[in-house]
């Protein structure tokens, strides 16, 4: 077996190449001692197994403990600590000179190296030609031109790994005699301590460049002081010598014929990064994403809903009736397992549409620019602009968004991002929005969803601002991010990335929703006295009584006593937001007698025909939904006979539904998110996030509902609005007091 490390600069296409090399044969774990995700994969060439470890993207292997991210530390340590046979160095052909700096450091390890020269098609389009044979000769290692996103050159790269055994010699750098003597003395000291010649050579260069994580700097201090007395800093001399050598190589192998594509990127950036237009363009992109997800994805939602309802709910119920199964078994299987499957599959088109659009923004190169657009606004409030990159990930799931905060340099910025990320609307919340949009906002639903996403972003920024003023005071780190050239992503790549994200989401959602639906079905079938109810709605069930006990707490935000299923949905939503839809779907179906199956009513072929018929019907109305949403289809009027109809009667109209959605958006993160907050920060920040999110969610929902209903009961509304305002002020005061308390404790500890 051959074990290879995959390393390169950020945005060089390393992850795309990793996916192309390993396909689906990947494993995800954690690096020892830290929470950074470790990705490994493997593939077979004949009978030879090759294992690939994907290292985090880095610009340099110099790891200075001051201001280094966990990702950079992992990459720097891995090339030393891991057992491997060769290194695959991914280089962006459009930025050859910049990326060869990391290559020059890798050569000093003395290990076999294969250079994967990626994005050759983009380089050619930008008028850049590279003589790969001459580059291979000058570097002394294999150089394989590839286009990872099209799988071009990947088989040749795989074959090269079979013959990758020749150790690479370091580049010959032009250094002064004094500097070279210091490096030689440093190398000899390391050899005398038992290091192999290759590692001694590598360590001497890293130590001279200021690497504080090697662990051997103490005994070399005298040599470094000697150098400082004679001439410039050695780290500067080494960097200058590297760039000089790299420039010589690039001059010999690279020619620029035309920069038309570069001009296109520059011209487009003048618009996208315009001082006044950049922010409106960013919001327009976000708006288009929700428009695309709700309208395009929603056009296929009825197909998945009707077909799975016919097969898994009505079909399983009918079959069990034919087998004379007890009512409680029918309820458990049809309205439990069947409804869980139906719920999970129904929101696939909306989630898939959003993942597709997110992949489009990311692969095109726009998402990196979005971080720069919001950087100025966030830094004005003392918040790190780099936080926005993990927060964008939160549109898919809050868990990887929080984990992505580890790429930030300072501990303060990491903690701020961890606390801000849960307010980003994840894809599970989008599934909830889609259900309520269908029931309460059939016209212009994308505007409702856009407003919720915007409120989530604003609340995240507000949370960061409050923490910056209280418990996490300090200055934001500057944003340093490479802007990739604009790409025209291939449909195959977009579909592949969408499929990978969707499969993970459906698996995660399904394994939670289906068991929860079964449990809810059981609790709704068991009476308070311990008996078993029939398949009809039971107001004496355990679930009903628990929900009715808690429901008065939510009365100020418009949830009335008879709408206890909505309360239960919030409770189960703390387990996972995906479960909310399943809870509502299951309970409203049972409360409203929806889904009761009899042999006379079940029509399998009719249901499947209706499912397929919904696609052209919804697509025919797509134009009016996109361009004239106010007069969009009236097809949703038939929802009065379904779960949506039951929901619309239980909630206090659109105002009550929107107040409920505000609470869903802002309240306590799911258990997975809470666990990762504790993992990435600590228990104190986890509980702070729980309390803060609940208070903010409750106050926002109550203030909105009472404000909307102010004319109906002005005195009551005024009392609630004032009470919520005071509760927020109290929590803010606690934050501020806790900071002072911490300050006194630290001062006492230091004396």
Swiss-Prot record:
Membrane topology designation: Multi-pass membrane protein
Residue sites binding GTP 1 per the record: 8-15
One GO MF term attached to the UniProt entry: ferrous iron transmembrane transporter activity
Keyword entries, A-Z: Cell inner membrane, Cell membrane, GTP-binding, Ion transport, Iron, Iron transport, Membrane, Nucleotide-binding, Transmembrane, Transmembrane helix, Transport
Compartments reported by the entry: Cell inner membrane
SUPFAM superfamilies according to UniProt: P-loop containing nucleoside triphosphate hydrolases (SSF52540)
One GO CC term on file: plasma membrane
Positions bound to GTP 2: 33-37
A Pfam family matched in the record: FeoB_N
Disulfide bonds: none
Residue ranges crossing the lipid bilayer per the database entry: 276-296, 341-361, 385-405, 422-442, 447-467, 512-532, 539-559, 657-677, 685-705, 715-735
Binding site for GTP: 118-121, 147-149
Domain FeoB-type G: 1-167
InterPro entries: Fe2_transport_prot-B, Fe2_transport_prot_B_C, FeoB_GTPase, G_FEOB_dom, Gate_dom, GTP-bd, P-loop_NTPase
Superkingdom classification of source: Bacteria
Family, as annotated: Belongs to the TRAFAC class TrmE-Era-EngA-EngB-Septin-like GTPase superfamily. FeoB GTPase (TC 9.A.8) family.
Function: Probable transporter of a GTP-driven Fe(2+) uptake system.
Record protein name field: Fe(2+) transporter FeoB
Species name: Legionella pneumophila (strain Lens)
Upper classification of the organism: Bacteria, Pseudomonadati, Pseudomonadota, Gammaproteobacteria, Legionellales
């Amino acid at each position: 077996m051959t074990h290879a490390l995959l390393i390169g600069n950020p945005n060089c296409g390393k992850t795309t190449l990793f996916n192309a090399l390993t396909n689906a044969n990947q494993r995800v774990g954690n690096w020892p001692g830290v929470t950074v995700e470790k990705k490994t994969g493997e593939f077979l060439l004949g009978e030879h197994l090759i294992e690939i470890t994907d290292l985090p993207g880095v610009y340099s292997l110099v790891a200075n403990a001051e201001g280094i991210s966990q990702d950079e530390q992992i990459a720097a340590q891995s090339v030393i600590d891991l057992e491997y046979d060769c290194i695959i160095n991914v280089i962006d052909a459009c930025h050859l000179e910049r990326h060869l700096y990391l290559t020059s450091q890798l050569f000093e390890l003395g290990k076999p190296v294969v250079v994967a020269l990626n994005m050759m098609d983009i380089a050619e389009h930008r008028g850049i030609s590279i003589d790969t044979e001459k580059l291979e000769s000058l570097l002394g290692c294999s150089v394989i031109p590839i286009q990872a996103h099209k799988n071009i050159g990947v088989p040749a790269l795989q074959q090269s790994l079979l013959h990758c055994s020749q150790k690479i010699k370091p580049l010959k750098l032009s250094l002064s005699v004094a500097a070279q003597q210091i490096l030689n003395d440093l190398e000899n000291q390391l050899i005398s301590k038992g290091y192999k010649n290759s590692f001694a050579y590598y360590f001497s260069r890293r130590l001279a460049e200021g690497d504080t994580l090697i662990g051997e700097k103490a005994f070399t201090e005298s040599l470094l002081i000697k150098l400082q007395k004679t001439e410039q800093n050695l780290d500067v001399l080494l960097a200058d010598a590297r760039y000089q050598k790299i420039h010589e190589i690039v001059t010999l192998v690279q020619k620029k014929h035309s920069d038309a594509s570069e001009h296109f990127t520059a011209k487009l950036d003048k618009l996208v990064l315009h001082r006044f237009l950049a922010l409106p363009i960013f919001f327009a992109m976000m708006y288009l994403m929700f428009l695309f997800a709700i309208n395009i994805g929603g056009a296929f939602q009825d197909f998945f809903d009707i077909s799975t309802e016919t097969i898994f709910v009505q079909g399983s119920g009918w079959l069990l009736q034919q087998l004379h199964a007890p009512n409680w078994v029918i309820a458990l299987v049809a309205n439990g397992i069947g409804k869980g499957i139906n719920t999970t599959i129904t929101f696939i088109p909306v989630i898939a549409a959003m993942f597709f659009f997110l992949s489009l923004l990311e692969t095109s190169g726009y998402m990196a620019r979005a971080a720069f657009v919001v950087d100025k606004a966030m830094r004005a409030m003392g918040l790190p602009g780099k936080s926005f990159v993990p927060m964008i990930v939160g549109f898919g799931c809050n868990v990887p968004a929080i984990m992505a905060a580890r790429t930030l340099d300072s501990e303060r910025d990491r903690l701020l991002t961890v606390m801000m990320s849960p307010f980003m609307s994840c894809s599970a919340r989008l599934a909830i929005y889609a259900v309520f949009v269908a029931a309460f906002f059939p016209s212009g639903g994308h505007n409702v969803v856009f407003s919720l996403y915007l409120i989530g972003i604003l609340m995240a920024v507000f949370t960061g601002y409050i923490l910056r003023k209280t418990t996490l005071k300090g200055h934001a780190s500057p944003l340093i991010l490479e802007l990739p050239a604009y790409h025209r992503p291939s449909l195959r790549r977009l579909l592949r990335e969408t499929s990978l994200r969707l499969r993970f989401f459906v698996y995660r959602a399904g394994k939670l929703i289906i068991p929860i639906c079964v449990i809810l079905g059981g609790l709704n079938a068991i009476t308070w006295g311990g008996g078993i109810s029939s398949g009809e709605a039971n107001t004496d069930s355990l679930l009903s009584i628990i929900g009715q006990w808690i429901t008065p707490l939510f009365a100020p935000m418009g949830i009335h006593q008879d709408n206890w299923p909505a309360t239960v949905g919030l409770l189960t939503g703390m387990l996972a937001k995906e479960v909310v839809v399943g809870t509502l779907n299951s309970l409203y179906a049972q409360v409203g007698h929806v889904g009761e199956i009899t042999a006379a009513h079940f029509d399998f072929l009719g249901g499947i025909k209706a499912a397929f018929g919904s696609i052209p019907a919804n697509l025919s109305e797509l134009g009016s939904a996109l361009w004239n949403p106010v007069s969009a289809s009236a097809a949703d009027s038939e929802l009065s006979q379904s779960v949506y109809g039951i929901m619309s009667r239980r909630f206090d109209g659109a105002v009550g539904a929107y107040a409920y959605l505000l609470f869903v958006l802002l309240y306590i993160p799911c258990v997975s998110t809470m666990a990762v907050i504790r993992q990435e920060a600590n228990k104190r920040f986890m509980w702070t996030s729980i309390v803060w999110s609940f208070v903010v969610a409750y106050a926002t929902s109550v203030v909105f509902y009472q404000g909307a209903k102010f004319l109906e009961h002005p005195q009551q509304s005024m009392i609630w609005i004032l009470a919520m305002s005071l509760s927020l002020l109290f929590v803010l005061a606690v934050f501020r007091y806790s900071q002072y308390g911490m300050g006194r404790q630290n001062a006492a500890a230091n004396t």
